A protein has these predicted regions:
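Flexible coil/loop and intrinsically disordered segments
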Residues: 1-201
Length: 201
């Protein structure tokens, strides 16, 4: 399992690795008999009661999900989503598609998966409280506009009523990747060969 943990750190960052190890203490993921089962069970547990994908330690799973999908779908484009600035802060950040200010206090739609994406911090700072149309205009000239996870910004509009569908689409994307294309996921995203996993035991 050491190779899996090393890949987690390399691809998703130290924050995710620390979070995963904390979850493993509760759920014993690493005692399962192969890497696919480890990741499947981790994803199932994370999604079981999740409505808030943004606050606290929840961001680590959300980043895992977005990076997994993006790196799988856009394997020809290599983005280092664990890149840090001089203060050791992540350069790629979670951003709300519909700004937080547009939600009433306690509105659970605000931090649902379907209302989040990954953007470069410089872009995020410019558009964090802009409406969807203004965000879309800024993103037209940014690399992020080409991301699979940011296809939403190619739509004419995005309303609160669209959040649940996008959440479902992203979860389905991750499920198809992990359940049906795990060997390809390992190669493209984790940079390891799935056929060699059993050598670790």
């Amino acid at each position: 399992m050491d190779r899996l943990l090393y890949s987690f750190k390399t691809v998703f960052g130290n924050g995710f690795l620390k979070y995963f190890k904390e979850q493993d203490k509760k759920h014993k993921y690493l005692k399962l008999d192969d890497y696919q089962k480890v990741i499947q069970r981790f994803i199932e547990d994370e999604q079981l009661f999740r409505t808030n994908y943004y606050s606290g330690t929840h961001v680590h799973f959300t980043r895992f999900l977005f990076v997994s999908i993006e790196n799988f779908k856009n394997n020809d484009r290599t983005i280092n989503f664990t890149e840090l600035d001089h203060k050791d802060k992540l350069i790629w950040q979670l951003e709300h598609i519909i700004p937080k200010s547009k939600f009433e206090p306690g509105d659970s739609d605000k931090n649902k998966l379907g209302n989040l994406t990954l953007l470069h911090r410089d872009t995020n700072v410019k558009i964090s409280d802009e409406n969807f149309v203004e965000k879309k205009k800024v993103l037209l000239d940014k690399d992020e506009s080409k991301f699979y996870i940011n296809e939403v910004f190619r739509e004419d509009n995005f309303e609160k009523s669209d959040i649940d569908k996008r959440s479902s689409d992203l979860i389905n994307d991750l499920g198809k990747i992990i359940n049906d294309n795990f060997d390809v996921y390992c190669k493209r995203v984790l940079d390891i060969e799935y056929k060699n996993f059993e050598d670790d035991f």
